[in-house]
């Protein structure tokens, strides 16, 4: 079967995946329009023609034909000036003004997929993906827009991006989206992931009404409060039914994502670079590549959307060799010691961790320069020998002797005013001349638009990584960008944020290729830059600085809505919790963190009782037996109320099921709650050691389980079912 079918006589392009069809057409005028995106159809006859009507106040570019207006056509990639008053995909300014008349020129079809220069993007071999490029051309300005489509048939995803190419004349890009998509109706619920610091990835649902629903970031990062992702769902969509269109932007900086309705009750979805703080100067014979948008569709609801997303990201987006490797159980010393540690204290903590069965020890902030608080030394990546007299190499050797790997925290994009680096290179910090610097967490951001700054980060981080047996890096970023520096020419000032991101991607590309055996975890005060652009380089992310088990229920649910469980860092922490003060049972803290994905601990084990340490050892033993199922199995969200949460994972071979239920608060005379599991082999017999019973798969999926009636706050159970 051809993944991309071209009906040349009608100039129709039919892109097909396992689940959906995506159809575009060239009209007789040369305009490229969108005809269909939805459940897969085998053939497209074009029997249902586009209807042309005379619409008042919708101008026509064709003299004498009042029925033809771009304002009501489902355009594939729109521009300004010819009568489409909806939000455009591309705005340019040059000596001819601001109008573009983009007409179809030609197409190219090939197996495989090209890399996007300087940008993270999906990938696949010639058997997995087929690509189409369509050139649109404006004759007056000599500008060519190339729309790039890559069809992943088995994974059921479509990748889209655009390239803007100048010819004889320069121009300035004032807005350039990666993709827009027109729908023939507006009957949608918009799903997005919102939040704030320590409360990331809240799954929100908003009915689409008259006007525009828009999210984005101008922080220089995708941010805690927004994620570059939107899903449009039919009003009846649930976990197991309904239409869901998902769109991801593979980018980590300023972005916009919107869906708007029109007077004709159609809608337009768009994603790309945020335009208020963006412009880009193109010289003659110059080009600009947009970030990539990933599109999917299912008629089977949000569970199928999630599982498709997990599969695609794991197979076609995460570049790291760790993508299919089990993530180690780690302990991070941050909430155990903060900045107040010595080598002796670290080794005491490591010894207890080793006895418990922990596999990786991560040394967090405070190991370098004169870093005894958050007011100094960022940028001075040299070991503090007062704290670590045997250096990183000596510490790593001692950790390795205990049977654990050694990991290290960095914040390479930042600089402290009180640092040797700032005293030597104050011009490397992002700040506006003539104005006081804007501090956040007593630090400034390094200017990654400068090659010498990127080179310094690469060299200084590499030097540390080569100095000891380091197996893991936690790459943090604890503030957003404020000032735009004066260093760029006036006509390039608004290129800064995108140039910064290109610099960061260059650094990450170099370091992750240079150190392929190191597991890189991203962090930005938790989930402040947890997006697909960063995940391309770093297969694991610290989901949130909030480690409270109850708070983590919604954070991890929202994160796992689109990101694979193997990428989600989740830790057991101390009580009272350091963020919210809540006291939860160790069992619940463990159960919730295990369901997050990449499991670990972040507390002072040396202060725990023998009973607590025995319980932690048992948690670790349990997690060893279920790690593959949780990190690489299928996730199913189950019955949820305002006071309860439940989910189960099913291993790829359906031989194991891990079920977790959490009740937040005890209620008087509470009714019994029954939960039905999902995804099991219906004919198989499963044994559950926690219950001492056996169950058939269809029994668990249709009758379900009655939850224990326990009068305790923050109660949870974990049941493991193994196929007999």
What are these regions (language model features)?
Residues 6, 10-14, 32-260, 276, ...:
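Polysaccharide-binding surfaces and accessory modules of carbohydrate-active proteins
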Residues 71-74, 79-110, 116, 242-253, ...:
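Glycine-rich, aromatic-flanked loop segments that form ligand/cofactor-binding clefts
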Residues 101-104, 280-299, 715-721:
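Short Pro-Gly-centered flexible turn/kink motifs
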Residues 19, 162, 285, 331, ...:
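Conserved, mostly hydrophobic/aromatic
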Residues 326-328, 335, 339, 412-463, ...:
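Active-site-adjacent "subsite" loops/lids of carbohydrate-active enzymes
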Residues 337-423, 455-459, 499-509:
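Aromatic- and glycine-enriched glycan-recognition loops and surfaces
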Residues 17-18, 37, 505-695, 709-710, ...:
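Active-site-proximal substrate-binding groove within the catalytic cores of carbohydrate-active enzymes
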Residues 359-367, 458-489:
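Active-site groove signature of glycoside hydrolases
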């Amino acid at each position: 079967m051809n993944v991309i079918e071209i009906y040349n006589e009608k100039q129709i392009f039919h892109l097909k995946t396992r689940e959906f069809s995506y159809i575009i057409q060239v009209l007789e005028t040369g305009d490229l329009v969108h005809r269909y995106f939805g459940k897969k159809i085998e053939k497209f006859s074009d029997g249902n023609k586009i209807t042309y009507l005379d619409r008042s106040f919708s101008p026509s570019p064709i003299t004498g034909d009042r029925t033809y207006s771009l304002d009501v056509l489902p355009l594939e990639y729109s521009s300004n000036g010819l009568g489409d008053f909806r939000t455009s995909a591309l705005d340019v300014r040059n000596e001819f003004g601001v109008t573009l008349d983009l007409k179809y020129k030609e197409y190219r079809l090939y197996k495989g997929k090209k890399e996007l220069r300087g940008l993270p993007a999906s990938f696949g071999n010639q058997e997995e993906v087929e690509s189409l490029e369509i050139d649109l051309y404006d004759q007056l300005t000599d500008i060519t827009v190339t729309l790039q489509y890559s069809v992943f048939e088995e994974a059921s995803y479509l990748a889209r991006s655009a390239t803007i190419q100048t010819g004889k004349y320069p121009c300035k890009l004032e807005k350039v989206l990666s993709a827009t998509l027109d729908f023939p109706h507006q009957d949608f619920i918009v799903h997005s992931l919102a939040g704030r610091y320590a409360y990331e990835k809240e799954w929100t649902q908003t009915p689409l009404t008259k006007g525009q629903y828009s999210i984005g970031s101008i922080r220089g990062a995708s941010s805690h409060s927004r994620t570059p992702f939107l899903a449009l769902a039919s009003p009846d969509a649930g976990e197991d039914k309904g239409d869901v269109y998902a769109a991801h932007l593979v980018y980590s900086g300023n972005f916009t994502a919107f869906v708007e309705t029109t007077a004709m009750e159609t809608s337009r979805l768009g994603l790309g670079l945020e335009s208020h703080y963006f412009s880009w100067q193109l010289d003659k014979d110059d080009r600009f590549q947009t970030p990539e948008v990933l599109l999917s569709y299912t008629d089977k609801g949000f569970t199928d959307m999630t599982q498709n997303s997990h599969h695609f990201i794991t197979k076609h987006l995460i570049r790291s060799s760790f993508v299919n490797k089990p993530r180690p159980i780690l302990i991070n010393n941050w909430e155990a010691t903060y900045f107040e540690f010595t080598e002796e204290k670290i080794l005491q903590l490591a010894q207890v961790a080793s006895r418990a069965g922990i596999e990786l020890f991560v040394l967090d902030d405070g190991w370098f320069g004169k870093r005894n608080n958050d007011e100094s030394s960022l940028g001075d990546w040299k070991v503090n020998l007062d704290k670590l007299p045997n250096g990183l190499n000596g510490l790593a050797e001692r950790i390795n002797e205990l049977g654990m790997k050694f990991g290290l925290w960095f914040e390479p994009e930042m600089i402290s005013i009180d640092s040797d680096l700032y005293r030597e290179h104050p011009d490397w910090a992002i700040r506006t001349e003539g104005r006081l610097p804007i501090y956040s967490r007593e630090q400034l951001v390094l200017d990654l638009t400068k090659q010498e700054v990127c080179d310094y980060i690469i060299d200084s981080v590499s030097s540390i990584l080569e100095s000891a047996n380091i197996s893991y890096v936690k790459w943090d970023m604890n503030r957003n960008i404020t000032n735009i520096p004066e260093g760029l020419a006036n006509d390039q000032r608004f290129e800064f944020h995108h140039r910064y991101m290109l610099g960061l991607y260059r650094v990450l590309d170099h370091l992750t290729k240079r150190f392929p055996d190191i597991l890189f975890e991203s962090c930005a005060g938790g989930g402040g830059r947890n997006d697909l652009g960063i995940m391309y380089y770093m297969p694991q992310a610290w989901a949130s600085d909030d480690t409270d088990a109850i708070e983590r229920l919604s954070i991890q649910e929202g994160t796992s809505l689109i990101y694979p469980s193997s990428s989600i860092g989740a830790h057991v922490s101390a009580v009272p919790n350091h963020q919210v003060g809540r006291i939860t049972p160790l069992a619940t803290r463990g159960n919730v963190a295990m369901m997050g994905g990449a499991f670990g601990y972040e507390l002072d084990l040396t202060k725990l009782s023998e009973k607590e340490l025995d319980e932690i050892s048992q948690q670790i033993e349990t997690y060893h037996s279920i790690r593959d199922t949780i990190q690489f199995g299928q996730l199913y969200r189950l019955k949820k109320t305002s006071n309860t949460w439940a989910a189960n994972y099913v291993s790829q071979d359906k031989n194991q099921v891990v079920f977790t239920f959490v009740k937040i608060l005890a209620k008087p005379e509470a009714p019994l709650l029954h939960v039905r599991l999902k995804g099991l082999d219906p004919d198989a017999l499963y044994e559950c050691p926690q219950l001492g019973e056996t169950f058939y798969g269809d029994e668990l999926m249709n009758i379900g389980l009655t939850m224990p009636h326990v009068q305790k706050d923050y109660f949870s159970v974990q049941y493991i079912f193994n196929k007999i």
